[in-house]
């Protein structure tokens, strides 16, 4: 059974980037299960109950696990900022994380090889672009056009 995840920031009861999370969830479901009915995360993430019971919950992380049948699991935890001071570069052209699979074994294996570094940057080469992405909060995308490289595209995963 294929399961996927959405990790959503909830700031004092306000669900952040809800439309982006809805789009990614429904795009994933449409790709794997074309006959699936679109879901609305707002039906599951009711604002007054978001993170209820989390001690000192100003910012909460919701973890939504979903699959063919819909939402399989929903959990809340306190949001904690991870401070990253060092990165290990890992080339992994065969890892495909286009869809946020709940099965993170290949990513966890790379993370285990980081040594003394706080996190990793995964480097994937492609004829048009290469992508670097960390396991924490951001994807970093760099496009190659006409022999030059553009840097600075930072895409939040939240």
Language-model features and meaning:
Residues 135-138:
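Glycine-rich phosphate/pyrophosphate-binding beta-alpha loops
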Residues 130-133:
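Short beta-strand/strand-turn micro-motif
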Residues 1-128, 141, 146-157:
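Conserved alpha/beta cores of soluble small-molecule-handling proteins
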